[in-house]
Amino acid sequence: MNEAAARVLVLFGPTAVGKTAVSLEVARRLGAARCAGAARLARAEVISADSRAFFRGLDVVTDKPTHEERERVPHHLIDCVPIDGTYDAMSFRADVERLVPEIVERGRVPLIVGGGTLYLGALLRGLFEGPGSDAALRATLADRSLEEIYKELCDVDPQAAASIHPNDRLRIERALEVYRLSGRPISAWQAEAVPSPFRFVVTGLERERAEHRRAIAERVRWMIENGLVEEFERLRAAGLTPDCQAYRTIGIPEAAAYVSGNITLEELQVRIANRTWQLARRQSAWFRQEKHVRWVDVTGRDAASVARDIIELWSRTSEGER
């Protein structure tokens, strides 16, 4: 198979916008769709680009697709990293470049679904061969305030600082890490990024602000009612510590504070909802910078109707169009 000719359907959007339900409908309906009288389209296989679904055990807190849903539609890159492990954008891209040809060879459509901007960026904007991670340097940066490290980034790489949200600690730390280890700003590395060998048909989901906030509040209530605190306690016993990459997942530090008696159940719910909304806004801002996106408004709609729109976009897209 010629990898350069492989088309990949990408479905992204901020957290709690409804990506999982829509992706399952897209995968199901692709099996029955016909493209302008052409041959029957293959069913999709989902490649997760959810930056926390990679980790085994983060089930409730990430609202992963259920085992039943994963049996109906094949999923990849879910539960592929131990709870105390690490996973980066380079590993993600390598996995995607391995999986896409395999999925296409099976006669199915590769469907990348998620909101992890770091990982999606490695695919859509290209990946650069910069320096690796340095644990000691990361620990030093972690001890400094967010305001301090963002100011440093503004000084050493204003171009990168302009493209990174001031509250996005992970990306700020990575930009400073690259600069300190290589002596070059990350924006210079990014200008040399290697493009993906695939052709992407990119669809983005958006939702009216008030409805989106209600959806986030409902998800947080569901998480707490379905065992968020118990999940945290199990993971802590299994080796999850504040030093772990998975510990940064929204809901985990808050659950730790609740278990320690530092916040009430009501405060737990409010804190998670507020952090989730802040994340959704940052993700939306990042997605809006991406070119060649077909936007689909999901406000007041069910997953089936949204999926029909996405399949129509996919079907209309010519082989040579990104």
Predicted regions and their residues:
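Phosphate/pyrophosphate-binding catalytic cores of soluble transferases and nucleic-acid-acting enzymes
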Residues: 1-322
